[in-house]
Amino acid sequence: MMSTRLILVLACLATGSLVGHEPKVTQVLSKDLTDIPGKEGLMLTVEYPPGGSDPVHRHNAHGFIYVLEGSVVMQVRGGKEATLTPGQSFYEGPDDVHVVGRNASQTKPAKFVVFLVKDKGAPVVVPAK
């Protein structure tokens, strides 16, 4: 017997009501770092809709985050949760697992810039547990 909650989730999926909570990621720049063999720089913007969040993941890269709009909550495994507002920054190292990445607001969007220094050709995001 299906619970009422499961029926509601399935109904939302069928109508697309749950779509829209995923972040919008836009590549701004990708550049081979010729002075650092095998590395490339990648700049992205990430827009979280109200209530938006990321799954647990890692970048296998040095990641520098700078908040442009709204408020975001970030945390790497073993670190403290940080709520960031415009003008604040956050760092993720190549061995870090990003366990919290979400919009702090359920009513307003948030936007930030990510600059990654990573192995050339390596995936930008790797799912993690």
Could you say what each language-model-derived stretch is?
Residues 38-43, 62, 79, 95, ...:
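Extracytoplasmic
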Residues 81, 96-122:
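Ligand-binding loop in jelly-roll beta-barrel domains
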Residues 59-79, 86-88:
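Glycine- and acidic-residue-biased ligand/ion/polar-headgroup-sensing regions
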Residues 33, 37, 48-49, 78-95:
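Short acidic-glycine-tyrosine-enriched beta hairpin
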Residues 37-38, 58, 66, 83, ...:
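Extracellular/periplasmic catalytic domains that process cell-envelope and extracellular macromolecules
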Residues 2-42, 75, 90-91, 109, ...:
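A short, N-terminal "cap"/entry segment at the start of jelly-roll beta-barrel domains
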Residues 29-61:
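N-terminal targeting signals for Sec/Tat export/insertion, comprising classic cleavable signal peptides
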Residues 53-55, 73, 90-103:
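Histidine-centered metal-chelating micro-motifs
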